[in-house]
């Protein structure tokens, strides 16, 4: 198994993000990638999201933030829903017949189940393969891509640690060779 890699080239990232809009239209898959790249959530948390987490059904508008409890850490996280994510989710939502607050954003094949991690992997891997992206693109690549661009834009390590719910900075630092 290879290590997941972020998408480092901005043009490749844009092509990846728009793959299910331009190349093989599928608004659910497009929304999955938009939310994945812009939220830094683990795929297990992303797939468990319900419409009520991102959209106020009664007021008929998208929330400014999504608040969820991470499966892996049990910690609560609050994530801003940016314009790009709202646009992707809005397009997808408009294509659906019925949206309920309790419904999964990314439903599985069977009634009242979330999309499986393996299917999410196939969706992401398919787009990466068709676009000839480097090896190592997987579900976790979306989370890493968020961090890569946030770091490149100068986001302080303390803020990234908060976004990723890390307690120690060395958890996220790549290992460096010892000086000779």
Summary of predicted features, one role per range:
Residues 45-47, 136-137, 147, 155-166, ...:
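Active-site-proximal segment of tyrosine recombinases
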Residues 10-39, 43:
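Basic, Lys/Arg- and aromatic-enriched nucleic-acid-binding interface segment
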Residues 48-76, 80-85:
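Conserved tyrosine-mediated DNA breakage-rejoining catalytic core shared by Y-recombinases
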Residues 36, 150-151:
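Short helix-to-turn junction characteristic of helix-turn-helix DNA-binding domains
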Residues 1-13:
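Extended, non-globular alpha-helical segments
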Residues 5, 71-90, 102-125:
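C-terminal catalytic core of Y-nucleophile DNA break-rejoin enzymes
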Residues 36-59, 158-159:
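Short, charged phosphate-coordinating catalytic segments
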Residues 169-180:
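Single conserved hydrophobic/aromatic residue that forms the stacking wall/gate
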